[in-house]
């Protein structure tokens, strides 16, 4: 299993709305794909901002390509992201999942 990890930040006052938007766009899209093993959205507030870390779990790199396209290192953005994000990583990190306890 492979974890796809991305980070971005919103203004604190936009955090709840962005979390709902993120769920409706990226998270639902990822979970609907073959080979998806689930998603996590982590949030923490600090300095007037809310930092989001997303973790998408996939069976293989081919499954990630179905979500991200050929450049699997590039982050995937949706139309309203510019409205919310004050900071964002343009790339993602991929990790092999060594331990999965459910």
Sequence positions of predicted segments:
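Glycine-rich beta-strand-turn "strand-cap" elements at beta-sheet edges
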Residues: 40-50, 76-102
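Short acidic, gly/pro-rich beta-turn/loop elements at beta-sheet edges
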Residues: 16-18, 64-66, 102
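Short, well-ordered beta-strand segments in beta-rich or mixed alpha/beta enzyme
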Residues: 2-9, 38-71
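Alpha-helix boundary recognition
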Residues: 23, 31, 65-68, 86
């Amino acid at each position: 299993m492979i974890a796809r990890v991305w980070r971005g930040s919103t203004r604190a006052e936009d955090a709840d709305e962005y979390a709902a938007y993120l769920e409706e766009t990226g998270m639902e899209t990822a979970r609907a794909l073959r080979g998806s093993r689930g998603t996590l959205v982590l949030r923490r507030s600090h300095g007037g901002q809310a930092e989001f870390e997303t973790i998408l779990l996939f069976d293989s790199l081919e499954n990630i390509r179905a979500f991200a396209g050929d450049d699997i290192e590039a982050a995937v953005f949706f139309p309203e992201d510019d409205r919310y994000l004050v900071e964002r990583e343009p790339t993602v990190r991929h990790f092999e999942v060594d331990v999965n306890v459910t």
